[in-house]
């Protein structure tokens, strides 16, 4: 239960930890509403989180671009994301965890979605350390490989 029960013209989501600017929801909404795009998301141009977290994010995005080339997006996990209900209905989403962002972007690539990005600031979480640990890199790689193999099989 979640995205699949949404029935509006647009579907959006954002993390609730205070690192992402709530006003960005309005900005991505205005951009998708006033354009012919399937998906609009933010791109974190200024980041105030820890250096190691920035490094993990850099390599994550680099690995994504290597395994899933051709997608017109810079920052895969940045939110808020908003997409049309019509586009959502075409996606074949399976993830119900942190990989959902990447899966949405993989599906956007597969479906040749028209994507827009808006720059944003990513604030430091002053209340807790990041949930992303070094060991998460191995989980990232595993999921990327699974989805890349799935894409190869789908294209046969």
Model-predicted regions and their roles:
Residues 2, 17, 84, 108, ...:
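Residue-level signature of catalytic and energy-coupling elements of molecular machines
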Residues 1-5, 10, 23-98, 125-135, ...:
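Acceptor/aglycone-binding surface of glycosyltransferases and processive sugar-polymer synthases
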Residues 8, 16-19:
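Short acidic donor-binding/metal-coordinating loop in glycosyltransferase active sites
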Residues 102:
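DNA-recognition element of transcription regulators
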